[in-house]
């Protein structure tokens, strides 16, 4: 591996793949982590037809494809499809040969150990990379915000987790993870629309609902008040969304009922604590001396934290939980959708990080289990 080789940073989210070159300030390409396969055989003989499509191409042809996400709740469930996504990332999107660049991958905390071993194996054996590293997503988000102490609340498409970090040290005993995130909200929104007579059932229609959710949903400062307002003055809350076939759909109280599940998961029938309680429990598992600094540095990251009012609502909920004299500060950086990737870009271009890479020689000596020794 030459000194000049720029590292590739690939943030494999459950919903989106963010990838680019180390040292850049934003990911070069962002595409959905989807693999689509045609539902029907092709009869137009002259037309070139692939057996599968990846990313944006799958998204554009979604009407004739069955779409599958290879990553569910942050864990890779289909390795063949995952390889296709990585292949697409390196050769079609970034247009680089992976055998010439070290690769930094990201992972959710508390993932099964076999998941990162298999990632390591595929990188070295299939893509022949000279070196690689696997980093925890939340730690990278903290790097991106320019802090060394804080509690990161990362919520993406598949996993939400809270990770307290003090002076650069992760406190693994205090990490909390809930397998409820953006995708669960999308599924629930589909159910609500079905109750109102709009059927969204296919995998392609699920993507339409995801778009409605991203464009129209917001978080209510006071859920009960907002419900009352939506019943009395529904016109203030309703928004019109145009479906791809030209039909119009009115989205009313779903706009705030859907993301409310982040704070009250029982709304969608989940038995896990809300985001604010998860963060509070994480802080309470930490040493009493550092709690004050953690309350003061609650950093949001991930696409599911992009809803309007989320920072204010989280501040309000945390203030109710914390001791009354405690100052609560929630930091919601505008680029938080990509902060994991940005942190990876910063980390992999540091000169001090260069000895951290798992090299090909080390992999050949020790096998995939080296990833547990070299990466946190």
UniProtKB/Swiss-Prot annotation:
Record's keyword terms, sorted: ATP-binding, Cytoplasm, Cytoskeleton, Hydrolase, Methylation, Nucleotide-binding
GO term, biological process aspect, one: symbiont-mediated actin polymerization-dependent cell-to-cell migration in host
Localization, UniProt: Cytoplasm; Cytoplasm, Cytoskeleton
SMART domains in the cross-refs: ACTIN (SM00268)
PROSITE patterns per UniProt: ACTINS_1 (PS00406), ACTINS_2 (PS00432), ACTINS_ACT_LIKE (PS01132)
One GO CC term, this protein: actin filament
Cross-referenced Pfam families: Actin
Domain of life where this protein originates: Eukaryota
Gene3D superfamilies, per the entry: 3.30.420.40, Actin, Chain A, domain 4
Reaction catalyzed: ATP + H2O = ADP + phosphate + H(+)
Protein EC: 3.6.4.-
Activity regulation text: ATP hydrolysis occurs in the polymeric state. Unlike for mammalian actin, ATP hydrolysis also occurs in the monomeric form and the release of inorganic phosphate (Pi) is more efficient.
GO MF: ATP binding; hydrolase activity; structural constituent of cytoskeleton
Residues binding ATP: 14-16, 18, 157-159, 213, 303
Residue positions where Tele-methylhistidine is found in the record: 73
General remark: ACT1 and ACT2 differ in their polymerization, filament stability and helical structure. Unlike mammalian actin, Apicomplexa actins do not form long and stable filaments.
Family statement drawn from the similarity comment of this UniProt entry: Belongs to the actin family.
Oligomeric form and interacting partners: Monomer (G-actin). Oligomer (F-actin). Polymerization of globular actin (G-actin) leads to a structural filament (F-actin) in the form of a two-stranded helix. Unlike for mammalian monomeric actin, monomeric actin is able to induce oligomerization with ATP or ADP. Mg(2+), which is used to coordinate ATP, is required for polymerization.
Physiological role: Actin is a highly conserved protein that polymerizes to produce filaments that form cross-linked networks in the cytoplasm. Polymerizes into longer and more stable actin filaments compared to ACT1/actin-1. Has ATPase activity. ATP hydrolysis leads to the formation of a stable intermediate ADP-inorganic phosphate (Pi) actin, which is followed by the release of Pi. ATP hydrolysis affects filament stability; ADP-bound actin depolymerizes much faster than ATP- or ADP-Pi-bound actin.
Name of the protein: Actin-2
Lineage, uppermost ranks: Eukaryota, Sar, Alveolata, Apicomplexa, Aconoidasida
């Amino acid at each position: 591996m030459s000194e000049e080789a720029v590292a590739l940073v690939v943030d494999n989210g459950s919903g989106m793949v963010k990838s680019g070159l180390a040292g850049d300030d934003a990911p070069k390409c962002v595409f959905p982590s989807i693999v689509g396969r045609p539902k029907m055989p092709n009869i137009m003989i002259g037309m070139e037809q692939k057996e599968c499509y990846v990313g944006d191409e799958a998204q554009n042809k979604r009407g004739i494809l069955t779409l599958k996400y290879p990553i569910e709740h942050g864990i890779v469930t289909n390795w063949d499809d995952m390889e296709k996504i990585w292949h697409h990332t390196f050769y079609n999107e970034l247009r680089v040969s992976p055998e010439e660049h070290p690769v930094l991958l990201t992972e959710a905390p508390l993932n099964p150990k076999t998941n990162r071993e298999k990632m390591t194996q595929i990188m070295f054996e299939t893509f022949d990379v000279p070196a690689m590293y696997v980093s925890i997503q939340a730690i990278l988000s903290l790097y991106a915000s320019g802090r060394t102490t804080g509690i990161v609340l990362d919520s993406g498409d598949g996993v939400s987790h809270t990770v307290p970090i003090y002076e650069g040290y992760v406190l693994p005993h205090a990490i909390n993870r809930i397998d409820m995130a953006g995708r669960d909200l999308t599924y629930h929104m589909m159910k609500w629309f079905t109750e109102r007579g709009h059927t969204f059932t296919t995998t392609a229609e699920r993507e339409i609902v995801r778009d409605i959710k991203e464009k129209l949903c917001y978080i209510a400062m006071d859920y009960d008040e907002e419900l009352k307002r939506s019943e009395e003055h529904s016109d203030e809350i309703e928004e019109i969304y145009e479906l791809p076939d030209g039909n119009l759909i009115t989205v009313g109280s779903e706009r705030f009922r859907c993301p409310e599940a982040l704070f009250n998961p029982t709304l969608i029938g989940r038995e896990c604590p809300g985001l604010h309680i998860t963060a509070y429990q994480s802080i309470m598992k930490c040493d009493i001396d550092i709690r004050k600094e953690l309350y003061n540095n609650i950093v949001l990251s991930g696409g599911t934290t992009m809803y309007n009012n989320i920072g204010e609502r989280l501040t309000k909920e945390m203030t109710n939980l914390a001791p009354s004299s405690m100052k609560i500060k929630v930091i919601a950086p505008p680029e938080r959708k990509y902060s994991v990737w940005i942190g990876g870009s910063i980390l992999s271009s540091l000169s001090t990080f260069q000895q951290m890479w798992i090299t090909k020689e080390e992999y050949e000596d020790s096998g995939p289990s080296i990833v547990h020794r070299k990466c946190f």
